[in-house]
Curated annotation (Swiss-Prot):
<feature type="coiled-coil region">
    <location>
        <begin position="153"/>
        <end position="202"/>
    </location>
</feature>
<feature type="modified residue" description="Phosphoserine">
    <location>
        <position position="286"/>
    </location>
</feature>
<dbReference type="GO" id="GO:0006325">
    <property type="term" value="P:chromatin organization"/>
</dbReference>
<dbReference type="InterPro" id="IPR003228">
    <property type="entry name" value="TFIID_TAF12_dom"/>
</dbReference>
<dbReference type="GO" id="GO:0005777">
    <property type="term" value="C:peroxisome"/>
</dbReference>
<comment type="subunit">
    <text>Component of the 1.8 MDa SAGA (Spt-Ada-Gcn5 acetyltransferase) complex, which is composed of 19 subunits TRA1, SPT7, TAF5, NGG1/ADA3, SGF73, SPT20/ADA5, SPT8, TAF12, TAF6, HFI1/ADA1, UBP8, GCN5, ADA2, SPT3, SGF29, TAF10, TAF9, SGF11 and SUS1.</text>
</comment>
<keyword id="KW-0539">Nucleus</keyword>
<dbReference type="GO" id="GO:0046695">
    <property type="term" value="C:SLIK (SAGA-like) complex"/>
</dbReference>
<dbReference type="GO" id="GO:0005669">
    <property type="term" value="C:transcription factor TFIID complex"/>
</dbReference>
<dbReference type="InterPro" id="IPR037794">
    <property type="entry name" value="TAF12"/>
</dbReference>
<feature type="domain" description="Histone-fold">
    <location>
        <begin position="413"/>
        <end position="490"/>
    </location>
</feature>
<dbReference type="GO" id="GO:0017025">
    <property type="term" value="F:TBP-class protein binding"/>
</dbReference>
<feature type="region of interest" description="Disordered">
    <location>
        <begin position="1"/>
        <end position="28"/>
    </location>
</feature>
<feature type="compositionally biased region" description="Polar residues">
    <location>
        <begin position="284"/>
        <end position="294"/>
    </location>
</feature>
<dbReference type="GO" id="GO:0000124">
    <property type="term" value="C:SAGA complex"/>
</dbReference>
<dbReference type="GO" id="GO:0003682">
    <property type="term" value="F:chromatin binding"/>
</dbReference>
<dbReference type="GO" id="GO:0045944">
    <property type="term" value="P:positive regulation of transcription by RNA polymerase II"/>
</dbReference>
């Protein structure tokens, strides 16, 4: 499977129209993405296309899915273009540097593909994780190693079972595809396609189960290490050292990247200086060739040559011109006019000497190191006229290069993290607490609760629908489960069942007690009225 949505066989831009082609702005072209995020975007693009094909491209749902896929493809194309341009510029810089150092050498090595780099990175991460786990096994006690092996065996058993199911589903899907290609009648062909869709859905469910299983395994490993570190000081020390080493490695990688950027800048500056020198040399050569043209005999030609020489010396030596003019004036006869003219010339020469720029005492280095502007995360401003800024100039408020915000892909959850954070913020603001922040563990717990609730309700309602022998899931199926088990009622829907209510007939003793209570109340009210009247008469 290729990670490029251009190879998917469907051109999503044709479905969305030509108006979306102008949606990519200059800010998006300056954005930077990692290869992992590009792969996630490509996977999202493929899933949207497959869903649109299954639903139908002409249906409104299919059109919405195709529109979303077209947006993702536009962003992906812009980012891939920027990446290709950067790679081309780097290759050009490398070739120019190699040619400047050794012009006879021709570069034959090709730039490695992004897929190869990603595979190498994945292999490195796997090797590092295996090394880390082996080193931890050496530190663990035999009892802890046994517990770890139990975890690993449970994971392997479930993993193998999922893989067997996956292979079985793949075989059935391949058989159905062959049968669909052989069939000519539309009726049985549609039935086979429906079966194929069911098998594909089962395959997706298996993938989700595997991701959950792997995540649970990773979390259980982390908790196991933490619990063991509480009782095992050697493991505690090893984990601390490993975290420190990881931080040092990250700092080294950052320093290496900065050094590489500085070297690239210096190389570019050297290339520019070489180009400027070459241009100056070419100009000098052209000027020398023009002066070495064979002279024509005659007084006019001699005069023209003398004028050219005088102009060249004047440009190279402005002070010499002043001295020659002074000597020529000294040779002439001294008069009042000549004296005033000489005074004016001396004043102008002194002014030019005063206002001339002096050479700096500190020499300016030819290679000036400048830092490249790093991409900045651009936050969306408030919905006001000026966007929450003092000036309405977007060129001054936006940074030079912007970074793409973290792109949240479909994580197979009912509720996304962004929606949950927005909900918590709104609840906190409504209650007057201000902005409230969720801990990572609490956030994952709430998302798991939402997933469990939705899966439980849907599973039970589907069973009720099957019990009614119907293929459609209706509101009454969900309502029955919610009312009986969760005491939740769906607004706008009422149950079809008729509930009988019993009328309660009180006994004679109960009625006598009620009558005595009411009579006591009446007597107490009369006594209070008589007391108030007697007080008024006394006053």
């Amino acid at each position: 499977m290729s990670s490029n949505p251009e190879n998917s066989g469907v051109n999503a831009n044709n479905n969305t129209g030509t108006g979306n082609a102008d949606a990519i702005t200059g800010a998006q072209q300056n954005m930077v993405l990692q290869p992992r995020q590009l792969q996630e975007m490509a996977a999202k693009f493929r899933t949207l296309l497959t869903e649109a094909r299954n639903v139908g491209e002409t249906t409104p749902r299919g059109k919405e899915l195709m529109f979303q896929a077209a947006k993702i493809k536009q962003v992906y194309d812009a980012l891939t273009l920027n990446r290709r341009r950067q790679q081309a510029a780097q290759a050009y810089n490398n070739t120019s540097n190699s040619n400047s150092s050794n012009p006879a050498s021709i570069p034959t090595e090709n730039v490695p593909n992004s897929s190869q780099q990603q595979q190498q990175q994945q292999q490195q991460t796997r090797n590092n994780s295996n090394k880390f786990s082996n080193m931890i096994k050496q530190v663990l006690t035999p009892e802890e190693n046994q517990e770890y092996e139990k975890l690993w065996q449970n994971f392997q058993v479930r993993h193998t079972s999922i893989k067997e199911k996956e292979t079985y589903l793949k075989q059935n899907i391949d058989r159905l595809e062959q049968e669909i290609n052989k069939q000519t009648d539309e009726g049985p062909k549609q039935q086979l396609q429906e079966k194929k869709i069911e098998l594909l859905n089962d395959w997706k469910v298996l993938k989700i189960e595997y991701t959950k299983l792997f995540n649970n395994y990773q979390n259980s490993k982390k908790t196991f290490y933490v619990e063991c570190a509480r009782h095992n000081p050697a493991l505690h020390k090893f984990l601390q050292e490993s975290t420190q080493q990881q931080r040092v490695q990250q700092q080294r990688v950052q320093q290496q990247q900065q050094q590489q950027q500085q070297q690239q800048q210096q190389q570019q500056q050297q290339q520019q200086q070489q180009q400027q020198r070459q241009g100056q040399n070419q100009r000098k050569i052209s000027s020398s060739n023009s002066t070495e043209i064979p002279s024509v005999t005659g007084p006019d030609a001699l005069k023209s040559q003398q004028q050219q020489q005088n102009t060249i010396t004047a440009t190279n030596n402005p002070r010499g011109n002043v001295n020659t003019s002074q000597t020529e004036q000294s040779k002439a006869k001294v008069t009042n006019v000549n004296a005033t003219a000489s005074m004016l010339n001396n004043i102008s020469s002194s002014k030019s000497a005063i206002f001339k720029q002096t050479e700096p005492a500190i020499p300016i280095s030819e290679n000036i190191s400048t830092k490249t502007p790093a991409p900045v995360a651009y936050r969306s401003n408030r919905p006001t006229i000026t966007g929450g800024s003092a000036m309405n100039a977007s060129a001054l408020n936006t940074p030079a290069t912007t970074k793409l915000p973290p792109y949240e892909m479909d994580t197979q959850r009912v509720m996304s993290k962004r929606k949950l954070r927005e909900l918590v913020k709104t609840v906190g603001i409504d209650e007057g607490d201000g902005e409230t922040v969720i801990d990572g563990d609490v956030e994952e717990l709430l998302l798991d609760l939402a997933d469990d609730f939705v899966t439980n309700v849907t599973a039970f309602s589907c069973r009720l629908a099957k019990h009614r022998k119907s293929d459609n899931l209706e509101a009454r199926d969900i309502q029955l489960h919610l009312e009986r088990n969760w005491n939740i009622r769906i607004p706008g829907y009422s149950a079809d069942e008729i509930r009988s209510t019993r009328k309660w007939n009180p006994s004679q003793n109960y009625n006598q007690k009620l009558q005595s209570i009411t009579s006591d109340k009446v007597a107490a009210a009369k006594n209070n009225g008589n007391n108030v009247a007697s007080l008024n008469t006394k006053k």
